[in-house]
Design a protein with these regions (language model features):
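A short, surface-exposed interaction/processing loop segment used at functional sites
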Residues: 31-46, 146-158, 234-262
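Flexible, glycine-rich surface segments
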Residues: 145-207, 211-214
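A contiguous strand-loop segment
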Residues: 7-88, 111, 115-116
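Compact, glycine/acidic-enriched structural inserts
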Residues: 83-112
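Short beta-strand scaffold segments in enzyme catalytic cores
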Residues: 9-15, 120-125, 130-132, 217-220
Length: 273
């Protein structure tokens, strides 16, 4: 397993034009020995309730009570922008705590003088607005959603020639979405999740015998506040949450993937992904 493969991630923000429903999917690929978990923070006077997933007290992605979703993915390293830098704290948690829309998230990035030089970020909200934020060439680049979908992989959309492109996983997701839309079938969270069938990575060892692959895949119905997470590509043991209920709780929750009580669910189709 090549290091860049182990670090590969796939993110989708999708709006069903027939129903207006909004979905988000993320496949987090990394080394499988990390202590990954879900963190749910309760609402307070100045902070929104929010759920994020990641490890080492750092949010890799998540969503808050207002339906603001974010995720990040590694990209080829770029020159740092003068006066800006990478975050020194849990940036994702801070954004989910304080922002309710894509525009507000962008304002926080600017206020905090954040310019990631080794990754980019996708933000999407409940209104149907979404953007991928990238930094290179001394400035911030915004790739706004221009139809009903936004896909993020590990290459810079504003500068694909920088590396990690072309990407067959990116092409596969786009192709499967096009097939789904042209089929005339009703679109739901399960079918949107199926577009990641070739984007996930089964466990494989690298030259140092360290296992890498898809740690978890999250499926979010932003409109209806539904959250499903598959750990290590399991289609039987799932974390299934009603976000409205979880965000109404008054205490912090931490769900470690190795110890959490999973739900066994018979799905309408055989696989989520």
């Amino acid at each position: 397993l090549h290091p860049t493969q182990a670090l590969s991630c796939s993110v989708l923000y999708y709006k069903d034009l027939s129903t207006g429903k909004i979905y988000a999917v993320n496949a987090e690929d990394y080394y499988l020995d990390v202590d990954a978990y879900i963190q749910i923070e309760p609402k307070s006077k100045r902070k929104f309730a929010r759920l994020w997933y990641g490890w080492d007290d750092f949010a890799q992605g998540g969503i808050n009570e207002h339906g603001l979703f974010f995720d990040a993915a590694i990209t080829p390293e770029q020159q740092k922008i003068k006066g800006y830098g990478n975050p020194r704290n849990n940036l994702g948690d801070k954004i989910l705590a304080l922002a309710s829309t894509v525009e507000e998230a962008l304002e926080i990035l600017e206020k905090e003088k954040i310019a990631l030089n080794k990754s980019h970020m996708l933000f999407g909200d409940r209104t149907g607005q979404a953007v991928i934020v990238e930094w290179f060439g001394g400035e911030r680049k915004l790739r706004w959603i221009d139809d009903n979908k936004l896909v993020m992989k590990n290459f810079l959309l504003s500068k694909p020639e920088a590396g990690n492109h072309p990407d067959f996983r990116y092409n596969s997701i786009i192709h499967r979405i096009n097939e789904l839309e042209s089929s005339g079938q009703e679109i739901n969270l399960n079918k949107i999740g199926n577009t990641f069938g070739l984007a996930v990575q089964p466990a494989r060892a690298d030259k140092n015998k360290r296992l890498g692959g898809t740690i978890y895949t999250s499926f979010i119905d932003i409109t209806d506040n539904k959250f499903v997470l598959s750990y290590r590509l399991s289609n039987d043991d799932l974390v299934i949450l009603d976000l409205k209920e979880e965000f109404a709780r008054s205490k912090r929750q931490t769900m470690n993937f190795e110890t959490v009580s999973y739900t066994h669910l018979t799905l309408p189709t055989k696989r989520i992904v």
